């Protein structure tokens, strides 16, 4: 006798089908935390000077934290994206970590356009839709679609630095000593590691990752 075995379809929908601006909640230190779908696929520049340094590893669902976190400070401007991966991965479960792509992100170094390969990073100035130009016509990436229509400014709540957060972009004038952060006024500013600016994690989900709807515009991993 021949038995036809049908596989049950996987629950939920693919995160790669969500609209930019929708929310995926993941547990961070046991607390459901909102992450915004910031882009689907490889970001496309809407200006001039993009150095084209995204590769296929970035062809997924870009997620950015809705709120700031007290993450690690910039330390002597070494490879801080590795530090934020270690810090962030310690707060999430294995299922979530496995859904995040190892991706190659562009950034500006002392020698010019460069890349860093990591799972969790900080947004670049250009990804937040700022036009901070480096040598020649090089930008560190391209705008994420969410920030074409939404501000990168975080709400000011009273503390002079509570709404400030680091980018992964280094200073064009002094990349050895200064990095760029987004201030509560909305300006991109540079500072050394003495700044109390916070972290806004950015990562890319595998587009086939399944999510389930919990309310309008809000999803969780299935």
Language model feature labels by segment:
Residues 1-222:
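Collagenous Gly-X-Y triple-helix signature in extracellular proteins
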């Amino acid at each position: 006798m021949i038995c036809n075995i049908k596989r049950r379809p996987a629950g939920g929908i693919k995160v790669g089908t969500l609209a930019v601006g929708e929310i995926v909640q993941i547990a961070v230190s046991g607390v459901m935390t909102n992450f915004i779908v910031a882009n689907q696929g490889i970001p496309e520049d809407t200006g001039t000077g993009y150095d084209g340094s995204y590769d296929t590893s970035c062809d997924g669902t870009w997620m950015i934290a809705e709120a700031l976190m007290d993450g690690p400070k910039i330390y002597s401007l070494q490879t801080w994206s590795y530090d934020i991966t270690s810090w962030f991965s310690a707060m999430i479960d294995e299922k979530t970590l496995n859904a995040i792509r190892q991706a190659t992100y562009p950034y500006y170094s002392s020698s010019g356009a460069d890349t860093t390969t990591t799972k969790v990073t900080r947004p670049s100035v250009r990804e937040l839709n700022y036009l901070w130009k480096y040598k020649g016509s090089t930008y560190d990436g391209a705008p994420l679609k969410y920030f074409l229509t939404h501000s990168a400014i975080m709400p000011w709540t009273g503390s002079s630095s509570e709404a400030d957060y680091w980018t992964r972009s280094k200073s064009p004038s002094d990349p050895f000593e200064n990095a760029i952060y987004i201030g509560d006024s909305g300006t991109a500013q540079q500072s050394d590691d003495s700044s109390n600016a916070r972290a806004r994690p950015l990562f890319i989900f595998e587009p086939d990752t399944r999510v389930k709807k919990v309310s309008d515009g809000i999803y969780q991993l299935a």
